[in-house]
């Protein structure tokens, strides 16, 4: 529909995600299907559907992954696996779609906290922030700026992941 309406497709940002705890011993198939479905399956098939128009426009794809793709979070087994798979998908698509389409990822750190998850109470949040080199949480605009950079100002970058986490990934 986008191509029909605007005549072209320049970018795809795969940002949809499910996020909830899946401690080992409590994981159900429905958890797997939900987390892998939103974090890997949907980006794969959206990217595949967009590949033709993106090749024509020499566009770009940005996947929003997570720093916990590289450093798994305790009790979030399936989420961490799904984000690691999305990082792998980013690299695979970069190879498959080059040289016409660039594919990269942005990995947020502490930006928005889940409201309904007691894992991230105020004490936990402050502990995480205290272990973040920049000593603050990020803003959604920090992610948006990184995505925009990869879409508009990074013509020689593909297959890469930019951590936007205040340095947290070097401290955990």
In which residue ranges do the predicted regions lie?
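Substrate-binding pocket helix/loop in short-chain dehydrogenase/reductase
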Residues: 23-24, 31-36, 116-117, 124, ...
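Active-site loop immediately N-terminal to the catalytic Tyr-X3-Lys motif
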Residues: 25, 71-77, 135
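Active-site helix of classical SDR
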Residues: 47, 82, 90
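A conserved structural motif in NAD(P)-dependent oxidoreductases
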Residues: 132-143
């Amino acid at each position: 529909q986008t191509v029909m309406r605007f005549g072209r497709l320049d970018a795809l940002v795969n940002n949809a995600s499910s996020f909830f705890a899946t401690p080992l011993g409590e994981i159900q198939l429905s958890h797997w299907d939900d987390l892998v479905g939103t974090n890997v399956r949907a980006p794969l098939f959206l990217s595949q559907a967009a590949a033709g128009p993106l090749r024509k426009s020499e566009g770009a794809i940005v996947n929003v992954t997570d720093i916990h793709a590289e450093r798994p979070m305790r009790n979030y087994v399936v989420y961490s696996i799904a984000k690691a798979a999305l990082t792998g998908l980013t690299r695979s698509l970069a190879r498959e779609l080059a040289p016409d389409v660039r594919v990269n990822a942005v990995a947020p750190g502490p930006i928005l906290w889940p409201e309904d998850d007691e894992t991230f109470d105020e004490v936990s949040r402050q502990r995480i922030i205290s272990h973040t080199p920049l000593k603050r949480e990020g803003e959604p605009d920090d992610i948006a700026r990184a995505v925009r950079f990869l879409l508009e100002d990074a013509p020689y970058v593909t297959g890469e992941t930019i951590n936007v986490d205040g340095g947290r990934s070097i401290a955990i």
